[in-house]
């Protein structure tokens, strides 16, 4: 397990200073910690596509953005990601929680299909991705 403050510290040392996204119960510790931090900014978004657009603006304004949302909202982010982020090679760190776990962990039925196709969708969008680190040692690699 990685504590939110440890993740934020490591990300800050890599230059990430602005967080954006939509509410997600799995991301609540990261969202709350980024909102409470004196050295970070958190900009709430009304949907996942807007979060990607906000991240682009943060980068163009000199910041380093982190976008956070559930994979169930990845579909909302496809167009701004492919037509803006990819086209203009804007670097962002995206954290998408995995709902509808493909390993058949119980979840809500509306998440099942997106859970199955999330990694394939990221590959189709030519997004470099990896699983979130499970502990602090993995985080610092």
Regions found by a protein language model. Give the residues of each.
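Thiamine diphosphate
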Residues: 1-141
